């Protein structure tokens, strides 16, 4: 299930474009996640008051959290699958503190791909999308394994 060197290159090339506006991309990802999967909002006490797209769009806290999410994901992606040291603390907080189900990681993965495809259509063709899907699946599978180590079936 590992990625080839070429696939990692595709993932990291497009991720460079994401990092050029990490806050904008992160904000869009979370807004889309909460719109497409409203049940995910229940896991974020500080965002429960954001009921409308305009409220979400105007929320600096949501924008900041979106940047945090994608920054952490970027650190993991840059490890090209050798991400144990970055993944373990993230999995621990998501399993024991936030209790984020693996299904929600699937949801956000889908949204990340949609947002990148919309913002960077010319640079994110079928091959790059397939590579990103594979990288995010590797991330999710490894998170799920860590969840089990922490006693969370997520």
UniProtKB/Swiss-Prot annotation:
Keywords: Cytoplasm, Heme, Iron, Metal-binding, Muscle protein, Oxidoreductase, Oxygen transport, Transport. It catalyses: Fe(III)-heme b-[protein] + nitric oxide + H2O = Fe(II)-heme b-[protein] + nitrite + 2 H(+); H2O2 + AH2 = A + 2 H2O. Heme b binds at residue 94. InterPro entries: Globin (IPR000971), Globin-like_sf (IPR009050), Myoglobin (IPR002335). The keyword Oxidoreductase applies. SUPFAM superfamilies: Globin-like. Monomeric heme protein which primary function is to store oxygen and facilitate its diffusion within muscle tissues. Reversibly binds oxygen through a pentacoordinated heme iron and enables its timely and efficient release as needed during periods of heightened demand. Depending on the oxidative conditions of tissues and cells, and in addition to its ability to bind oxygen, it also has a nitrite reductase activity whereby it regulates the production of bioactive nitric oxide. Belongs to the globin family. This is Myoglobin. It comes from Gallus gallus. The gene is MB.
């Amino acid at each position: 299930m590992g990625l080839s060197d070429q696939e990692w290159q595709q993932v990291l090339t497009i991720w460079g474009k994401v990092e050029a506006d990490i806050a904008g991309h992160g904000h869009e990802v979370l807004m889309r996640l909460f719109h497409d999967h409203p049940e995910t909002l229940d896991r974020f006490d500080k965002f429960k008051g954001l009921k409308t797209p305009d409220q979400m769009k105007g929320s600096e806290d949501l924008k900041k959290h979106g940047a945090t999410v994608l920054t952490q994901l970027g650190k993991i992606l840059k490890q090209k699958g050798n991400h144990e040291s970055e993944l373990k603390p993230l999995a621990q907080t998501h399993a024991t503190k936030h209790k984020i189900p693996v299904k929600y990681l699937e949801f956000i993965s889908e949204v990340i791909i949609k947002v990148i495809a919309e913002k960077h259509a010319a640079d994110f063709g079928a091959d790059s999308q397939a590579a990103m899907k594979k990288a995010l699946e590797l991330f999710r599978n490894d998170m799920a394994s860590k969840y089990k180590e922490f006693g969370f079936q997520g």
